[in-house]
Amino acid sequence: MTKGRLEAFSDGVLAIIITIMVLELKVPEGSSWASLQPILPRFLAYIFSFIYVGIYWNNHHHLFQTVKKVNGSILWANLHLLFWLSLMPIATEWIGTSHFAQNPVATYGIGLIMSAIAYTILENVIIRCEGENSKLKEAIHSKFKEYISIIFYVLGIATSFFYPYIAIGFYYLVALIWLIPDKRIEKSLKEN
């Protein structure tokens, strides 16, 4: 499989994930502003998840700018990431319909941490396949953002059982960290 085909497949899966999430939003029953109130938790959950999917799509794009060719290991690592991201519509709907209850917020966090781990695995597989001359290895020599994200996810999951809104705050902090695209890869590609 070519790199372009893998990227197109991934883009398609991510687009479907967003489509599924937006289709879960229901039209309000009334015509007043007050009729929006019942769907507000689901809408907020959708916005949050949309941002996360967008972050992964953006970083996936940057990640594959460094890749020259793909092999079976990269394909499977990429599918592993897409698997965890594909569960996001379920978790999104659950936290929205439960109004951010404890177990749904914990489950959402587990999905986020598993997606982060899968993304890190994908990075490592690409580096291993590219060898010592890996542009990705050169670009991401520091993994501070990755490590702090995992710590915040763990804190969020642990906190979710007592204070689910604080847990959402931890997940929100991770999104803020990654909202600005990681410039390490672009910088490394320009230097080479």
From Swiss-Prot:
Subcellular location: Membrane
Keyword Transmembrane helix: yes
Annotated site residues (Hydrophobic filter residue 3) in this chain: 23
Membrane topology per record: Multi-pass membrane protein
Example of a GO MF term: proton channel activity
Cytoplasmic side: 25, 66-71, 127-133, 181-192
Subunit-level organization: Homotetramer.
Domain notes: The six transmembrane regions are tightly packed within each subunit without undergoing domain swapping. Transmembranes TM1-TM3 are positioned on the inner circle of the channel tetramer and participate in inter-subunit interactions that are central to the assembly of the ion conduction pore. The RxxxFSD motif within transmembrane TM1 coordinates a network of specific inter- and intra-subunit interactions with other conserved residues on TM2 and TM3 and plays a key role in the tetrameric assembly of the channel.
The protein's name: Potassium channel HX13_20290
